[in-house]
């Protein structure tokens, strides 16, 4: 199924192979999520866990990138967002292998009897303090419902020995997250610093951690070139998804 020849729909984001409605989700489809979903390593992946799936964006992107026998579990605490994710999945080509769970990951994870070789999350990163317009948006953006130490501990209990935990965070918060992860026994294996253009400092960082030690590969990604069009590297990373690339 492809939406490439269809009329663009409102209240969501149209990709080449699927549509993500997000009008009932606190966090909308954005560059952070698209970067993470396109970047996460999927070679030899057999089972995927998406923590805090929101609209289902990451689950859908990873389903597109993996073999048809790879199950994806997507966990979302907010009932309204989870319902929208379920609808997005149902209208996608991968409804048979993506399961959306309306639950708190801290309750859901201990009940699982299988481990995941890819765990992915676009996690909250603001400390509580500044009020949000809605409780749902606060939940999606603030670490009060899932702090980074808890996320790392849950992932450690759910991951295979050679699996990857992948996140996207603002640069400075990503550095603190890395220190927290290293102190808990994780190993940083992949890091991509993301800048808007060559003249700017990185503002986001893509991180992949593993329980297994190994060499860490680091690089830099620039989103836009001098002409303000998407750079060759960003296009190469995301062109399987963006409708007009």
From Swiss-Prot:
Pfam families: MTS (PF05175). Belongs to the methyltransferase superfamily. tRNA (adenine-N(6)-)-methyltransferase family. It catalyses: adenosine(37) in tRNA1(Val) + S-adenosyl-L-methionine = N(6)-methyladenosine(37) in tRNA1(Val) + S-adenosyl-L-homocysteine + H(+). Its main location: cytoplasm. GO terms for biological process: methylation; tRNA processing. Specifically methylates the adenine in position 37 of tRNA(1)(Val) (anticodon cmo5UAC). Gene3D superfamilies: Vaccinia Virus protein VP39. It comes from the Bacteria. One of its GO terms (molecular function) is tRNA (adenine-N6)-methyltransferase activity. PROSITE patterns: N6_MTASE. It comes from Salmonella arizonae (strain ATCC BAA-731 / CDC346-86 / RSK2980). PANTHER family: TRNA1(VAL) (ADENINE(37)-N6)-METHYLTRANSFERASE. InterPro entries: DNA_methylase_N6_adenine_CS, SAM-dependent_MTases_sf, Small_mtfrase_dom, tRNA_Adenine-N(6)_MTase, tRNA_adenine-N6_MeTrfase. Keywords: Cytoplasm, Methyltransferase, S-adenosyl-L-methionine, Transferase, tRNA processing. Its EC number is 2.1.1.223. It is found in: Cytoplasm. GO terms for cellular component: cytoplasm. This is tRNA1(Val) (adenine(37)-N6)-methyltransferase. The keyword Methyltransferase applies.
């Amino acid at each position: 199924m492809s939406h490439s020849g269809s009329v663009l729909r409102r209240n969501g984001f149209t990709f080449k192979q699927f549509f993500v409605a997000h009008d009932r989700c606190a966090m909308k489809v954005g560059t952070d999520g698209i970067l993470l979903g396109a970047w996460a390593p999927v070679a030899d992946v057999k089972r995927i866990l998406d923590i805090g799936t929101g609209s289902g964006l990451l689950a859908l992107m990873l389903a597109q990138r993996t073999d048809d026998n790879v199950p994806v579990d997507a966990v979302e605490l907010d009932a309204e967002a989870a319902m929208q994710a379920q609808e997005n999945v149902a209208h996608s080509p991968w409804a048979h292998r993506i399961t959306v769970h309306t639950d708190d990951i801290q309750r859901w994870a201990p009940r699982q009897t299988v481990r995941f070789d890819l765990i992915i999350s676009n996690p909250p990163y603001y400390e509580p303090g500044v009020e949000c317009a809605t409780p749902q948006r606060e939940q999606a953006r603030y670490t009060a419902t899932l702090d980074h130490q808890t996320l790392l501990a849950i992932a450690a209990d759910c991951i295979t020995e050679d699996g990857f935990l992948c996140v996207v965070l603002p640069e400075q918060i990503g550095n603190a997250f890395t220190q927290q992860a290293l102190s808990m026994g994780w190993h940083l294996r992949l890091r991509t610093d993301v800048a808007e253009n060559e003249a700017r400092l990185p503002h986001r960082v893509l991180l992949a951690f593993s329980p297994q030690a190994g060499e860490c590969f680091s690089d830099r990604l620039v989103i836009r070139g001098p002409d303000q069009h998407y750079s060759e590297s960003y296009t190469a990373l995301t062109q399987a998804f963006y409708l007009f690339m």
